Amino acid sequence: MHFIDEVKIYIKGGNGGNGCVSFHREKFIDRGGPDGGDGGRGGSVIFRSNHHLNTLVNYRYKQHFTAENGENGKDSNRSGKSGKSLVLDVPIGTQIFSEDGNILFYDFTVDDQSFEIIKGGSGGLGNSHFKSSVNQAPRKRTEGEIAEEMWIHLSLKLLSDVGLVGLPNAGKSTFLSVVTAAKPKIADYPFTTLVPNLGVVYVDDEEFVIADIPGLIEGAHQGHGLGDKFLKHIERCNVLIHLIDGSSNDVVADYNTVRLELESYSDYLKNKIETICLNKCDVLTDEEIQEKINKLQKVTNKEVFPISTCTNAGVNKIVKLALETIKNQE
């Protein structure tokens, strides 16, 4: 399954049906009055959030969507049938923007939300509406309303409580696999994670959602590497878990690289609560661990937690701390 989180599509409401020109015809009634019915209303275009979806791949290849037109009016004052509305399902976390991205029309944050973005066109009036004392046999009717059409931009931001950040190969995917049932691709080389991965963490009969975002590199906010494409997915989370590769020769530089990218991308990310973890401590001596923690704490003025996703050392503490932070923000 391809992970698609940005698409542009064309949508159009259904046109209203035309009104009918008709006159009553019945045996022994030579000149019946007007009995043209109204046209049916066109179908609307409606978006609906669906928790079964997690990508916009359904809109990658088909990009034009039109609701059904209303039927024309009929004789005997029969109205045309209304057109069926077009319901388009999207994942929770989808945002609907104008084509240029400057106007946010709607933001889906829970399951089964609906948003009518285009109303169907009104049906035209049949000639029976235009009968008057001076015109007993009107041939006037109105045409159905032409429905609105537009190009829109759909953008998916994954909904998670916790976002995992760090340089490539910091151990984020391993962390996710240890604390959840998610099975991300894991290998000992950069950019193993090519798409965001989500997992559910269960702690003491409670749960939260955690997202593993592809590794950041210097210049990610400018489009370098993979990070720029996926940074938006952690804008909604409550807390960031920042993993640093303890085997790195310069853990402070690694930390600063990621922080710069977060701060350059948006104020939302800049101000997120951050839990800093020194990972891969299983390959370090106690003295090396303490030395690197001291360096990080001097720069960050925050507590730094030593962990190992290989031995699970310290991981459970981080998970419980994340849950506590989430609950304190609710």
UniProtKB/Swiss-Prot annotation:
GO terms for molecular function: GTP binding; GTPase activity; magnesium ion binding. It is found in: Cytoplasm. It is an enzyme of class 3 (hydrolase). Signal peptide: none annotated. GO terms for biological process: ribosome biogenesis. It comes from the Bacteria. CDD domains: Obg (cd01898). GTP binds at residues 166-173, 191-195, 212-215, 279-282, 308-310. Mg(2+) binds at residues 173, 193. Residues 1-159 form the Obg domain. Keywords: Cytoplasm, GTP-binding, Hydrolase, Magnesium, Metal-binding, Nucleotide-binding. Its EC number is 3.6.5.-. Residues 160-327 form the OBG-type G domain. Its cofactor is Mg(2+). Pfam families: GTP1_OBG, MMR_HSR1. GO terms for cellular component: cytoplasm. Belongs to the TRAFAC class OBG-HflX-like GTPase superfamily. OBG GTPase family. Monomer. An essential GTPase which binds GTP, GDP and possibly (p)ppGpp with moderate affinity, with high nucleotide exchange rates and a fairly low GTP hydrolysis rate. Plays a role in control of the cell cycle, stress response, ribosome biogenesis and in those bacteria that undergo differentiation, in morphogenesis control. This is GTPase Obg. It comes from Rickettsia rickettsii (strain Sheila Smith). The lineage of its organism: Bacteria, Pseudomonadati, Pseudomonadota, Alphaproteobacteria, Rickettsiales. The gene is obg.
